[in-house]
């Protein structure tokens, strides 16, 4: 009972305070703040453009003879008439990579395969069988367009794909 009377006394004591007189009431009485004006200058934008990264990798320059000293070679102009196509990476290289997992499992990966990936698997097996003396172990992933071959054959497969015109 004493607590209730104390609360009532406190409520009566704060009667002169208006409820809700916070930021909302103050913002309605004042105008918008005065911001300093600005000047838009396009003359200096060339310095900003130098800092922005390029949106795409530029096309490689034309050379007198191929392969270049670095070993790069462009794809054949009419693409080869095969049921599959191996697209170049964004740096214009043949997408054949070495992969090692679990410390000693060596794999070669061909990425960016479009079309009939099973025909590519058969051609790769026909190409590598004389080198190995047996049929290589391969794994096809149709969803990601990758072909994995057990062992390191990246240099041989890159040369073979370049010879085919990819």
Swiss-Prot record:
One of its GO terms (cellular component) is mitochondrial large ribosomal subunit. Keywords: Mitochondrion, Ribonucleoprotein, Ribosomal protein. One of its GO terms (molecular function) is structural constituent of ribosome. Belongs to the mitochondrion-specific ribosomal protein mL49 family. This is Large ribosomal subunit protein mL49. Its main location: mitochondrion. InterPro entries: Ribosomal_mL49 (IPR007740). It is found in: Mitochondrion. Interacts with OXA1L. It comes from Macaca fascicularis (Crab-eating macaque). Residues 56-78 are annotated as: Disordered. One of its GO terms (biological process) is translation. Pfam families: Img2. PANTHER family: LARGE RIBOSOMAL SUBUNIT PROTEIN ML49 (PTHR13477:SF0), MITOCHONDRIAL 39S RIBOSOMAL PROTEIN L49 (PTHR13477).
């Amino acid at each position: 009972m004493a607590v209730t009377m104390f609360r009532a006394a406190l409520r009566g004591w704060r009667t002169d305070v208006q409820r809700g007189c916070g930021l909302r009431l103050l913002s309605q009485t004042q105008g918008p703040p005065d911001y300093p004006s600005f000047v838009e200058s396009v003359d200096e934008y060339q310095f900003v453009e130098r800092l922005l990264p390029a949106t795409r990798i530029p096309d490689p320059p034309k050379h007198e003879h191929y392969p270049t000293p670095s070993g790069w070679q462009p794809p054949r102009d009419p693409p080869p008439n095969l049921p599959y196509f191996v697209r170049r990476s964004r740096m214009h290289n043949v997408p054949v990579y070495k992969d090692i997992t679990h410390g000693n499992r060596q794999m070669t990966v061909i990425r960016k395969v479009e079309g009939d990936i099973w025909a590519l698997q058969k051609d790769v097996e026909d190409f590598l069988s004389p080198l190995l003396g047996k049929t290589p172990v391969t794994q096809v992933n149709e969803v990601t367009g990758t072909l994995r071959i057990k062992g390191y054959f990246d240099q041989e497969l890159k040369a073979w794909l370049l010879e085919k015109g990819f």
